[in-house]
């Protein structure tokens, strides 16, 4: 698991189960239920690095669409509406992507 040493498998599994239906993803609930919201800044930055698949120092819309698959390869892709809502929630400077500080603020919100 990509998040071994950061998150507990059981918490990740429960978080994924809670949003397995299309349209049910809520980033705030997910970050809390998987345990990321309670982690240190360093752990949140490590998580950002895993989600930032192309290592551009930003999480772009396509990476957000596949967000859940970072936690489990069998997880679903987010719908376009979920992806856009997730991006809007995290993109505080309006540049169309989420930087590490924006991600940390969203996780801790």
Swiss-Prot record:
InterPro entries for the chain: EF-hand-dom_pair (IPR011992), EF_Hand_1_Ca_BS (IPR018247), EF_hand_dom (IPR002048), Parvalbumin (IPR008080)
Family annotation (Pfam families): EF-hand_7
Chain residues that bind Ca(2+) 1: 52, 54, 56, 58, 60, 63
GO cellular component, one term: cytoplasm
Binding site for Ca(2+) 2: 91, 93, 95, 97, 102
SUPFAM superfamilies tied to this protein: EF-hand
Similarity comment: Belongs to the parvalbumin family.
Task performed by this protein: In muscle, parvalbumin is thought to be involved in relaxation after contraction. It binds two calcium ions.
Name recorded for this polypeptide: Parvalbumin beta-2
Organism: Gadus chalcogrammus
């Amino acid at each position: 698991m990509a998040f071994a040493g950061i998150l507990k498998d059981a918490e990740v599994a429960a978080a994924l189960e809670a949003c397995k239906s299309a349209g049910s993803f809520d980033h705030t609930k997910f970050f809390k239920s998987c345990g990321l919201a309670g982690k240190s800044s360093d752990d949140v930055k490590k998580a950002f690095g895993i989600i930032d698949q192309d290592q551009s120092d930003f999480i772009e819309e396509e990476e957000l669409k596949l967000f859940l698959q970072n936690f489990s390869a069998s997880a679903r892709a987010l719908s376009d509406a979920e992806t856009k809502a997730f991006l809007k929630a995290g993109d505080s400077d309006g540049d169309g992507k989420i930087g590490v500080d924006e991600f940390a603020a969203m996780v801790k919100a």
